[in-house]
Amino acid sequence: LCSSFSILFLFWSITRLGIKAIVRKGEEFTTAKQWAVIGAGAVGGLAYTFSDSFWFSAVEGEVYAMSSFFTAFVFWAILKWEEEDTTNPIGAMRWLVVIAYLMGLSIGVHLLNLLVIPTICFVYYFKKHKFEWKSFIITGIISLILLGGIQNIMIPKIVKFAADYEVFFVNKLGMGFNVGSIVYFVLLFTAITSLILHTINKKESYYKFGFYTAVLFAAIATISGYGASALITRAIVLGALLYGIHKLKTKSENTLNVILISFATLIIGYSSFFILIIRSQANTPMDENDPENAITMLSYLNREQYGDWPLTYGQYYNAPTKSQQYFKDGEPVYAKNEKTQKYEITDDRKKSIPVYEEEYCTVFPRMWSQQANHEASYRYWGDVQGHHKKKVKMNEQSGQMEEVQIPTFMANLNYFVGYQLKYMYLRYFAWNFIGRQNDIQGLNGNPLEGNWKTGIKGVDDFFLDTDTAFVQHAAKNNMANNSFFALPFILGILGFFFQYKNNKGDMWVVSLLFLLTGLAIVFYLNQYPYQPRERDYAYAASFYAFAVWIGLGVLFLFDLLSKKSNAKTAAILATVVGLIIPTIMAAQGWDDHNRSKRTMSRDFAVNYLNSCAPNAILFTNGDNDTFPLWYAQEVEGIRTDVRVVNLSLLQTDWYINQMRRAAYESAPVPFTIPAEKYVQGTRDVVYIMDKGTGPMNLKKAIEFVESDDPTNKLDYGSRPLDYFPTNTFYVPVDSMQVMREKVVAVKDTARLAKNIKWTINRSYLTKNDLMVLDLIAHNNWKRPIYFAVTTGAEAYLGLEEYFQLEGLSYRLVPIKNTETEMQQGGRVNTDVMYDNIMNKFMWGGLDKKGVSLDENCTRMASNMRMQMATLAGALINKGQKQKAEKVLDLCLEKMPDENVRYEATLYTIIAGYYQIGNMKKATDLSAKLFDIYENDLKVYQSQKSIHRASFNREIGQAKEIMRRLVMLAEQFKQDAHSKELMTRLTAIVPMEELMPQEPQGPTQQPEQVLQ
């Protein structure tokens, strides 16, 4: 619905701008021009409807559809103000009030909508003033100040002041909880209401009461701030606002009235956030950040879990920090203490903000992330090898002198232009209006993945620097291969020039909307390399602005055709020609945006839940692993006995508290560490310092860490550090309890371990790791504990030897995997997993002809294929070949190549067929997989040398898969097949590169095969 209304407002906006551009002063708005304007609105609206990014947002359960709605609504509303201001300037002011209210509401959706503010200012400017560069620049400065004031002052400070009031009234004045918040809102409401009443009734008493209330409000806000700098800043800013109110009262009360009412309605819209507080008070099962009061609400608004990044001045990726004495202080973290009836500081954040060596810092920092895996990409995109300063310094770890390369500002700009601007914005722009190559995520700029294209081979070959007819298997028949032939782009450029020629003021307005929702976001996001997903949705408002020009392009055609034909005929022809463009866009984009056959997110979420025993605790990691499971439980009520615990969120105290509450049919997670021991700022990191004492009982280890005894801490100046005195732990196994809880099958009781003993090969653990260990130490097998197969080795804490695969999750069991089991992917409970896959699992439409699967879906499906191959291998090892064949057949049936492309995981399927004796199916699949990798290898090897390095991993994988297919055929005496494959392999891979190795077990995991 939001997306539909966005298109309606876009249509109205284009027609309004079209009328202003096509009807010159003194001219009649003829029927032909009316038809042309309606055609322009239709073409522009439909072009945006079928643009890739907007279409994706329209069918995605995210905030961006509603964000587009507010952007479209506000832009149309300011055009309505402009239209009515000529005939009824006083009445038109109501549109400004509506805009303020919409802005307030939009804050609760996404801050991107605030970028329309400068556009609003320039519509006002061009309506009230003639163009002059001086006034134009002043308007731009004012608009940016207004934008910055709302985003960086009003939005955070309204809640920040409430939080400061709360702490001040409770801690300083000794009053009860929430008194400060109540006083804050009463004063704010009273001051605004009284001042508005004064502007209406002109009563001086209202003004005095409101103004003095505002003074009192400002005084408390000032003295309740943390630190001298906050006190001084607040005194200056709030004093200036009070002075401005007083001056406006004497000069223009009408202006003061509009400002106050707009501010009030903006706050009313912003107050939609109170829903979060009300909801949080109910302690719902899903309650992110637990925003029950002003203190926690501030943390929620500040998005503290996402961190921050430098914009105007900051460090390069390899910048060393100065010593901690130079670090800056952050604002302290307060938490409510019910016992003391105070807000207590749990993390003073003193010396918590790092300060970097100036030599490694720059203005406009773009290459700032210090994650180790980002450096190579920074060096590539920034051409650091060609633009750097050399410095010799000591390596702190090795103690050796080494030469480091400090990027120059030119390298910084190279990265900004090459990666952030071109690759992470203009590439997305081209997807929407020129064409798209495929939906494989582009990470390193290679010519085969995620690029734009026109559909004109010569043009695409030139710009992509490759033969576009020659593609890898994963990209063949990719539904996101969309050719627009650059027609929307061309029509948009024509529309831009038409508007420039006929109405420069509106051209500036649309251009500002285009730039501020495009380039300005590029600047603000300051994206690091290897983003977890494509980010085109963030720039949808910029594409919205370009769609305006696409619509106006129809008027360009009308203007051109009307010079050579009848005006009405020209209007019809221009519209028909224009409509060809959204028709092409719809036809090309329909298949990859059609989700009617796909229910993967829901079905696979249910599969994760059904992989667990009753009353289980399932650890997941990341949004994609967690949100669908929450949906299945919250909306459809599926397996609400399973407690889903997100490891990313488990690093926060509020989430741990929520896990300690019951939810639906799930009992509380039995953590034992007291809340005050894990509150934010406490035990966020626990170091591992092996003192050589040998294995330690995990319960004792947890007691050691949670103790506040100074002898249990590492001495680190004023901040003692928590640590484990060993990296090897054990948990005694109560065999009777294991039997009572039916943790393992009766037939496996002989393999029960007396202790679970393992080593954590890490130097430190984070709070989520500590809580997982606490659970394992004290659970005593009462609740089944599972880890989703997608959480990753880091989350497993070295416990893999005690994992048992039961579907899409590993169960922690007191049985140690044998070396053979570990080589074959780990122990599998074949009875449980076979029943889950064959009888319980759903397939999300993977087997439906023409189903649209994006890269994420394909990755999930490949993971499912891998788990089924693992089950088949385990069944084969137990001699249950018929069951294994059923699993393998089901895998091929539910995940055919046309939907889920064959890739490395198919190797294990092939090995399974060989081992059960189905040689025909094995060799047929082997031939297909060999064909795929033979083609892919030729594609990669055909790339120019400048690009080939980015495919080193794929080239190595292709060679290894083909070599192992030959070895499998030899191992199972398929001589003709092996000879054919070997002949083809040696024709494209030199013999010296085919290192002779012993054949790997046929049930080995693909990742292990390809290491």
Sequence positions of predicted segments:
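ER/secretory pathway lumenal C-terminal domains and tails of membrane proteins involved
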Residues: 16-24, 53-54, 59-68, 73-98, ...
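Acidic/glycine-enriched connector segments
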Residues: 11, 15-19, 34-41, 68
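Phosphate- and divalent-cation-binding pockets in alpha/beta enzyme and binding domains
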Residues: 627-631
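Short hydrophobic/aromatic helix or loop-helix immediately within or flanking a transmembrane segment
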Residues: 1, 5-8, 464-466
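Short helix- or helix-capping micro-motifs
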Residues: 41-49, 103
